[in-house]
Amino acid sequence: MAANFWESSHCTEWLLDRNKIEESNPKDKQYLTPIELKKLRTHYCFVIQNLGNALKLRQRAISTAIVYFKRFYLKNSFVDCEPRLVAVTCLYLSSKVEECITQAKKCAAKMKEIDHSFNYLMNDILECEFFVLEELDFCLIIYHPYKSLPFYLQSSGLDPASIEIIWGIVNDSYRTDVCLLYPPFVVGLGCILLGSYLLKKDIKQWLSELNVEMKDIWEVSKDLIDYYEFEKQQSLQNQSELDLLYNKLPIRNKK
């Protein structure tokens, strides 16, 4: 494990450019429009979040699982690798990495409660885990904004109510691609910038004293605004509509 972010595989191997992300899910694009594919990608972030909540896992483990899922589908497509199974497997794997271990059998049973059409069992998850590990190149340590955020929030002078909203924005950020594009401290600052704007809090002086590159921080805020607009316009949790999109894909080995 690297002693700090800048020496880690997260920094040296898994910070990507937008073109790399846009090239992902190539086979799925034969069956879904870009908007439909974006809806499904976002939906599985909700799936992981909801399953993690049901299993009472820490938010950090849930966020790590979402990053695993996003990284996995940079190399793979939904049609080749069943996304519900991969989502559950990523969460099971992250629970071990983040030291809040749950059982594969429990993951399968709880997912079945959430999605009655989920027919995968413990052995399917354990088998899938080896494939996920290979596709992640065994790079399992994920750095999150959660570590640097308390320091920035304390020094910003924002009130407790504003801070709580910003924590929510950070969790929402995992439904975007900013975790693949920017270092975690940049993501955290982008969330603070957006939160202060929405709450009409002036933090310009504080930001100027941080001596950080503002371009990427603005980009993170813009990506989050785009996501919230997308969420307003699309039925991201309309299960019947999402089922229709899922069924448009000729997924191999679907149970």
From Swiss-Prot:
Q: Name one GO molecular function term.
A: cyclin-dependent protein serine/threonine kinase regulator activity
Predominant localisation class: nucleus
Coiled-coil region: none
Q: Does the keyword Signal apply?
A: no
Q: What are the alphabetically sorted keywords of the record?
A: Activator, Cyclin, Nucleus, Repressor, Transcription, Transcription regulation
**Which locations, inside or outside the cell, does it occupy?**
Nucleus
Q: Which SUPFAM superfamilies match?
A: Cyclin-like (SSF47954)
> What cellular component terms from Gene Ontology apply here?
mediator complex; nucleus
Residue ranges of domain Cyclin N-terminal in the record: 46-134
BP term (GO), one: regulation of aggregation involved in sorocarp development
Self-association and partners: Component of the Mediator complex.
Similarity comment text for this entry: Belongs to the cyclin family. Cyclin C subfamily.
Q: What does this protein do?
A: Component of the Mediator complex, a coactivator involved in regulated gene transcription of nearly all RNA polymerase II-dependent genes. Mediator functions as a bridge to convey information from gene-specific regulatory proteins to the basal RNA polymerase II transcription machinery. Mediator is recruited to promoters by direct interactions with regulatory proteins and serves as a scaffold for the assembly of a functional preinitiation complex with RNA polymerase II and the general transcription factors.
What PANTHER family does the record point to? CYCLIN
Protein name per Swiss-Prot or TrEMBL: Cyclin-C
What species does this protein belong to? Dictyostelium discoideum
State the gene name recorded for this protein.
Answer: cycC
